[in-house]
């Protein structure tokens, strides 16, 4: 599979790429900004939640700076509230791998392709989600926001994964993500393959604009894409029109 394309490292997003996520990210942001008086039913809440959706994939600290640009104290307080709310939400949620995710990881490993999970979320969230989904032992490397100077859309998470995995060249790397920030990070890293998945919060057009070389419906379509060197059955080439699958969200 992966070795036919020369891919030796697959950098996958977490929630919405490998792991199903039924809105817990945005609900956690809603809880966090409510601690700062921005509550449901107000225009301020609607405006900020629209900003949250657009900024999905970025580090929580960066998102809060976007939401409270003129008040550092409120931004930091909201970030702390988010960092408490999300692990609690994961602990209460039924976290499962997306359909086909486990099989894809097994096929990548069988093809001698190392697997890294990258996220702009905190390490505690990364570990909790991987443990809950039963994926952690299938992954070679994990990189969270604490491990890098900058989260997505900067390329730091991807580049750190490359360094830790000791890949020979960036052309041997595939980045798979469902947010425009994650896809842009893959493009800026120079990765040979940058795949947008439609199980995340952002539509195909936005993923293409961010630099996706291919668009696939879900992680389950990755083996055919990498193995054949062509778009997987049912996938949308990066230059073609595509529609959004409204099933999940990604970080």
Task: Name every feature range the model reports, one short phrase each.
Residues 48-52, 135-151, 172:
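A short, structured active-site edge motif that brings together acidic residues
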Residues 29, 81, 101-131, 143:
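Substrate-recognition element of Asp-dependent hydrolases with the DxDx(T/V) motif
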Residues 1-12, 232-246, 250-251:
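Non-catalytic pre-domain segments flanking phosphatase-related domains
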Residues 174-214:
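Acidic, Mg2+-coordinating phosphoryl-transfer loop and its flanking beta/alpha structural elements
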Residues 150, 156-158, 171, 203-241, ...:
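Short acidic, glycine/proline-enriched helix-loop-strand junctions
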Residues 102-109, 162-163, 183-188:
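Surface-exposed amphipathic alpha-helices with a cationic face
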Residues 3-102, 107:
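N-terminal helical cap/lid subdomain that shapes the substrate entry/recognition surface
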Residues 152-180:
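Conserved Lys-Pro-Asp/Glu-containing loop-to-beta segment of HAD-superfamily phosphomonoesterases
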């Amino acid at each position: 599979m992966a070795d036919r394309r020369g891919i030796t490292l697959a950098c996958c997003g977490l929630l919405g790429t490998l792991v199903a996520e039924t809105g817990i990210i945005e609900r956690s942001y809603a809880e966090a900004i409510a601690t700062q008086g921005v509550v449901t039913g107000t225009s301020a809440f609607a405006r900020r939640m629209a900003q949250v959706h657009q900024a999905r994939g970025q580090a929580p600290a960066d998102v809060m700076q976007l939401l409270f640009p003129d008040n550092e104290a409120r931004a930091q307080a909201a970030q702390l509230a988010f960092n408490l709310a999300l692990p609690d939400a994961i602990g209460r949620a039924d976290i499962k791998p997306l359909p086909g995710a486990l099989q894809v990881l097994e096929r990548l490993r069988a093809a001698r392709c190392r697997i890294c999970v990258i996220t702009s979320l905190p390490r505690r969230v990364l570990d909790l989600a991987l443990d809950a989904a039963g994926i952690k032992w299938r992954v070679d490397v994990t990189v969270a926001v604490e491990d890098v100077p900058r989260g997505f859309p900067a390329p730091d998470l991807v580049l750190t994964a490359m360094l830790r995995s000791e890949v020979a060249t960036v052309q041997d790397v595939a980045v798979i993500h469902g947010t425009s920030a994650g896809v842009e990070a893959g493009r800026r890293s120079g990765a040979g393959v940058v795949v947008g998945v439609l199980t995340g919060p952002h539509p195909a057009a936005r993923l293409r604009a961010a630099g996706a070389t291919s668009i696939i419906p879900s992680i389950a379509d990755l083996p055919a894409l990498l193995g054949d060197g062509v778009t997987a059955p049912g996938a949308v080439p990066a230059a073609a029109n595509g529609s959004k699958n409204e099933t999940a969200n990604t970080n």
